[in-house]
Amino acid sequence: MALKTFRPITPSLRQLVLVDRSELWKGKPVKALTEGLTGSGGRNNTGRITARRMGGGHKRRYRLVDFKRRMKPDMPATVERLEYDPNRTAFIALIRYTDGTLAYILAPQRLKAGDTVVSGEKVDVKPGNAMPLRNIPVGTIVHNVELKPGKGGQLARAAGTYLQLVGRDQGYAQLKLPSGELRVVRGECFATIGAVSNPDQANVVIGKAGRNRWLGRRPSVRGVVMNPIDHPHGGGEGRTSGGRHPVTPWGKPTKGKKTRQNKATDKFIIRRRAK
């Protein structure tokens, strides 16, 4: 897939850069593999905003993507087509197992309609195949990696991302993350070979505020332009600097302050991410 630029017949088209999705499926998704999706607007069960700058956007149906890849061990599946998924930046692939079962998986790079994928204990090292990390050769690029065996892939699921298997030690696999972090995961955890599709997503330019609204992203308002009741940086006559180190609306330090709290998993991190 390539990038598309546009002739500037309107101001927003001058900057707009989009991914060319002309090769993807143009019809509707498989109805049995989708379900309704209600947007939360960033509100929790009490109706309070817990995630700011969310809401609105185009209505979506949720595609049930198989992140576990343990449904049909050692049964080959043929890629029927590649599809767009509005719920993620990566493309998804519709696969049909030899017994006729349909499923969606994350599409890796270089996967195309007609290819065969399989998941199991020991399978070929080719894009789209899934197997435990203990059986994958060191140096291999992988994505959709589990943190706990059987839980389903959690690492490297966004467009263009991948991890590199750099070693194995005492039943654990050592993985290099996109951030530069080096961490270990149990060898029984499944991973899929290859990098995630749609690497051009990194070069997309939205072009106008309205396109962000279509995606469900609301405006981000700086605290320094608010009133004192709304933000610690608010108030003052004319333009002010805020008068203190940057904080969130709730007074917690931000912009570079370390926020990692989970000490229980520190033992799985060999080297922290690059600063």
Swiss-Prot record:
Residue numbers spanned by region Disordered: 36-55, 224-263
GO cellular component: large ribosomal subunit
Molecular function as annotated in GO: rRNA binding; structural constituent of ribosome; transferase activity
Keywords assigned: Ribonucleoprotein, Ribosomal protein, RNA-binding, rRNA-binding
UniProt key word Heme: no
GO BP terms in the entry: cytoplasmic translation
Superkingdom classification of source: Bacteria
SUPFAM superfamilies per UniProt: Nucleic acid-binding proteins, Translation proteins SH3-like domain
Subunit: Part of the 50S ribosomal subunit. Forms a bridge to the 30S subunit in the 70S ribosome.
Family per similarity comment: Belongs to the universal ribosomal protein uL2 family.
Functional summary from the UniProt entry: One of the primary rRNA binding proteins. Required for association of the 30S and 50S subunits to form the 70S ribosome, for tRNA binding and peptide bond formation. It has been suggested to have peptidyltransferase activity; this is somewhat controversial. Makes several contacts with the 16S rRNA in the 70S ribosome.
HAMAP family xref list: Ribosomal_uL2_B
Protein name: Large ribosomal subunit protein uL2
